[in-house]
Amino acid sequence: MKKGLFIVVDSGEGSGKTLQLNKAKEFFGKDLVLTREPGGSPYAEEIRNLILKSANAHQADAKTMFGLFWAARADHLKNTIVPALKAGKVVISDRFDSSTFAYQIVAQGARELETFFWQMRDFYLKDLKPDLYIYFDIDPVIGLARKNNQGGGELNHFEARQIDFHNQLREGYKEFMAHVPHEVIDASQPIEKVWGDFKKVLEKSLSKK
């Protein structure tokens, strides 16, 4: 089914990923569809608010979050990603199933869901699995310091967790990436150097489209 190109960009907190994605959108223009998770479609954005902004979200365990993320992802796929790919667009998602694995399976410690995760991935994605994952790697100490220095309001309940959580998160991403086509970018570099590396990876991927 897939006519376009599907790329996921993911990272822990404070990598500068969102800034780099905005630069990509500006550089590559209208043929690039930039979306995000959780969210990316009207109903999935409502689930995003439930996941990140609900007053009681911090009380939800990994199993609850796991279900909510996959529900949002199903709607996101149907209403945003699939139509764009059918139209031959390049879709870049700011987070995707890689985050579910890193956050819920590893950092939140729900290893009992690991086999189920891969089953869910096969069931929901089928032939829609991303062509490439780009992981912005950064030491959590540096990333969290950046996040705190940026200001921009209160941290969500994931961002506000202790450093051990974020160290586990980094390990979770590395573990997931071993299973999929991926590129790693050193996000601790200066912004323009990160952009140069990111642009090079995107141009290489687009040349194969």
Question: For the regions a protein language model found, what residue spans apply to each?
Answer:
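ATP-dependent small-molecule kinase phosphotransfer cores
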Residues: 32-125
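Walker A/P-loop
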Residues: 18
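NTP-dependent small-molecule kinase module
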Residues: 25, 141-209
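ATP-binding Walker
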Residues: 14-15
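Hydrophobic anchor at the beta1->P-loop junction of P-loop NTPases
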Residues: 7-9
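A glycine- and Lys/Arg-enriched "phosphate-lid" helix/loop adjacent to the NTP-binding pocket
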Residues: 98-171
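Extreme N-terminal, non-catalytic leader segments
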Residues: 1-5
